[in-house]
Amino acid sequence: MAKASKGKHQSGPSNHSESIDLVRKALYGNKKVRSLKMNPDMWEKHEVINRAWRIHEYRQEKQRENLLKNQFSAMKIACEELKHTSETLYKAAMSDSINRRFPVETRTPTDTPPRLSK
């Protein structure tokens, strides 16, 4: 049997939190964001480009929202038209049927068979 040493032998970091910090740095990297060092002219160009990009993204988002609003209103109008045309078809379309032929949860078929676990 080996003789137990009197002092604690530490080959790694001095305490537990340092080792956790080292693991976090290794896994996730350093989260500190370095500021860009630019001359004033380059900084102004950078700001103009960022502003233009934000405006572009804002306009795209508004366009998407308008498209979705239009789709929703068209669906609503179509449902109302169906309701006026045929009440039975409207009820069938609006019912949440459990006996669907292809449920949403069904996996898509693939060309290869699934892997069997060993």
From Swiss-Prot:
Pfam families with a match to the protein in the record: MRP-L28 (PF09812)
Q: Does the keyword Transit peptide apply?
A: yes
For this UniProt record, the keywords arranged alphabetically read as follows:
Mitochondrion, Ribonucleoprotein, Ribosomal protein, Transit peptide
A molecular function (GO) term:
structural constituent of ribosome
Annotated compartments: Mitochondrion
- Transit peptide, first to last residue? 1-35
Domain of life of the organism encoding this protein: Eukaryota
State where it is primarily located. mitochondrion
Q: How does it assemble?
A: Component of the mitochondrial large ribosomal subunit (mt-LSU). Mature yeast 74S mitochondrial ribosomes consist of a small (37S) and a large (54S) subunit. The 37S small subunit contains a 15S ribosomal RNA (15S mt-rRNA) and at least 32 different proteins. The 54S large subunit contains a 21S rRNA (21S mt-rRNA) and at least 45 different proteins.
Q: Which family does it belong to?
A: Belongs to the mitochondrion-specific ribosomal protein mL40 family.
What role does this protein play? Involved in mitochondrial genome encoded proteins translation.
Protein name (database record)? Large ribosomal subunit protein mL40
What species was this sequence derived from?
Schizosaccharomyces pombe (strain 972 / ATCC 24843) (Fission yeast)
